[in-house]
Amino acid sequence: MGNGVQEGSVRLREDAEAVLAGAVSSKRDHRQVLSSLLSGALAGALAKTAVAPLDRTKIIFQVSSKRFSAKEAFRLLYFTYLNEGFLSLWRGNSATMVRVIPYAAIQFSAHEEYKRILGHYYGFRGEALPPWPRLLAGALAGTTAASLTYPLDLVRARMAVTPKEMYSNIFHVFIRISREEGLKTLYFGFTPTVLGVIPYAGLSFFTYESLKSLHREYSGRPQPYPFERMVFGACAGLIGQSASYPLDVVRRRMQTAGVTGHQHGSILSTLRSIVREEGAVRGLYKGLSMNWLKGPIAVGISFTTFDLMQILLRRLQS
């Protein structure tokens, strides 16, 4: 009888320890998710604000039939500054922040979760993922974020290409689109967005994670320096944006069709229209050189900020 009581108390203690361990693990998981959300939000906000004037200029060229050149782009920036003031260069940035903060928070947090899930599935717990799951984690993270925040991206594009008299604020854009064009307009361009996000996010995260892994292997240091992270992020942005750029042009044309005089159409009809009117290379890669300037800066800032914030928050928690 004494042995039975002793065995029962041992089992009870083991059960209590298991419950306690589960609670601690759950609390740690919640902290990790919140940490990723916060770090991602800050990373996205800093990166997009830094390149907002270049981003607005790129969108204006993407949705028009004007030929793009670096000279014309900087002339547009200069005349916008002269005619509308310095802060007008950031017009639409409030809408960008409303979209980018949740988008980046979701994307980075989802990426961490997908890495964990795929690591468990492929048997790489606590280790760097092999190439294919690494690419898949990035693509899934980008698709998740784009699906949840797409209407905000359309609103941002509308505000970037219209004069301030047309839309007074973000809510005004939503109201006018709903009344004049219908709610379904808020998802025009969604398909090319997702088709573009898959290679963009997949290749961006894949390149950045791969470069960090190679750095760790060859340098012997567990963590890169901040400037090295910036370089890795810049390379990731350059590769990701170059691969997905034509679909980005198609997406912008579809999003802004209601205010630029173009007809709403499918992906293929929009592609054909761009190629017919402007040519394949000039039309589908219009503004790419500006993206090669702003993309690496934005992605470098974004990835570096996220990593450094994660390190800081882990230290504070410990």
From Swiss-Prot:
Subcellular location: Mitochondrion inner membrane
Transmembrane segments annotated in the record for this chain: 33-53, 89-109, 135-155, 186-206, 230-250, 293-313
Reactions mediated catalytically: ADP(out) + CoA(in) = ADP(in) + CoA(out); 3'-dephospho-CoA(in) + ADP(out) = 3'-dephospho-CoA(out) + ADP(in); adenosine 3',5'-bisphosphate(in) + ADP(out) = adenosine 3',5'-bisphosphate(out) + ADP(in); AMP(in) + ADP(out) = AMP(out) + ADP(in)
This protein's UniProt keywords: Membrane, Mitochondrion, Mitochondrion inner membrane, Repeat, Transmembrane, Transmembrane helix, Transport
Gene Ontology annotations for the cellular component aspect, listed alphabetically: mitochondrial inner membrane; mitochondrion
MF-aspect GO terms: ADP phosphatase activity; ADP transmembrane transporter activity; AMP transmembrane transporter activity; ATP transmembrane transporter activity; coenzyme A transmembrane transporter activity; secondary active transmembrane transporter activity
One biological process term in Gene Ontology: coenzyme A biosynthetic process
Membrane topology: Multi-pass membrane protein
Start and stop residues of the Solcar repeats: 31-117, 129-214, 224-312
UniProt function note: Mitochondrial carrier mediating the transport of coenzyme A (CoA) in mitochondria in exchange for intramitochondrial (deoxy)adenine nucleotides and adenosine 3',5'-diphosphate.
Family: Belongs to the mitochondrial carrier (TC 2.A.29) family.
Protein name stated in the entry: Mitochondrial coenzyme A transporter SLC25A42
Source species of the chain: Mus musculus (Mouse)
Lineage: Eukaryota, Metazoa, Chordata, Craniata, Vertebrata
Gene: Slc25a42
